[in-house]
Amino acid sequence: SLRRSSIDFKFLSFQNPAFKNRKKETKNFLILLAPAIIGNGAYQINLLIDMILASTLPDGSISYLYFADRVNQLPLGVLGIAISTALLPILSQHVKERNVIEANASISESIKFGIYFSVPALVGIFLLSNQIISFLFLRGEFSLEDSKLTSLALTALCFGLPAFILIKILVVPFFANEDTKTPIKVSVFSMSLNLILNLILIKEFLHVGLAIATS
């Protein structure tokens, strides 16, 4: 039916000259992509490690960490991802034009913007963690004790919020310069440190210790 409609799909062919011309660019993109995924995914990998270790703790520990992380992800997603997404094309253009002064100014403004919004978010979550968790989850099988234990995990996680947001911003200059090695080195160090702190803090503070290690 597609042939009868005279629709030309030659542009999808690997023999298409346009595809061949883009082969080098595509290869470079894929080379840069893998480290970027690992560099940006360090937080999620740390969270996965937390969940695995939480499975060895009393029932409910995984849920406490998961719900606390969902709440903590809201300002992280809104601020960190939004700022980094807006910064990347601007910074890439400055790098392309070799405009170091404007590039540094853009980075500085983004960092200031991230701090201005993340610190109040941290304070708000710290002061209202119990109320936030109770409002969102205190119903059905989710008891008052569950709410308290989840709010403790949220309180621990929120202290890392400014750093989480700044990380999203600070990796942008490296990606704009096509340097994916530095972020991945930092990510590997971060994940190693998180694992060590997990093993130390889990004994005394249980699931809250895992949240502290992540922060």
Model-derived regions: residue spans:
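Membrane-embedded alpha-helical bundles of multi-pass transporters/translocases
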Residues: 1-215
